Amino acid sequence: MVSIHICAEWCHLFLNGAVYDVPKAICFGDDKAAARILATEDVAEIKALGRLVSGYDESLWNGVRQIVVYEGLLAKFSQNSGLSEQLKGTGQAFLAECAVKDRIWGIGLSMHDPNRLDRAKWQGQNLLGYALMMVRERL
């Protein structure tokens, strides 16, 4: 396994989601997949390539992915004072990613679902919300 370090130069990858899938490919030694992901800006293609990473081990990735996203978000918000101020402006609010189809990074509920306000009724893990709150605390 290759060690992963998200450097500040990778912030542009957030524009297309590759900040998640490139380290995933690198983590499992799939340099070809990493290169193919970097060669495209098509979000759907990036996601598809990320699903095809050779040697992928879900148990291992589940332990690494939160660190990858946290480091990427920290770099992104540290380099952009406007974004940083917006995030800090949320104060102590509990942040949630309202995404019906995403039960890992989101809460599995839409922005219009009244259950979004009740954490006991969330259908997802909200890993993105937790990562954003960690970054906010660090800033």
Per-region residue spans from a language model:
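Charged, low-complexity intrinsically disordered segments
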Residues: 1-139
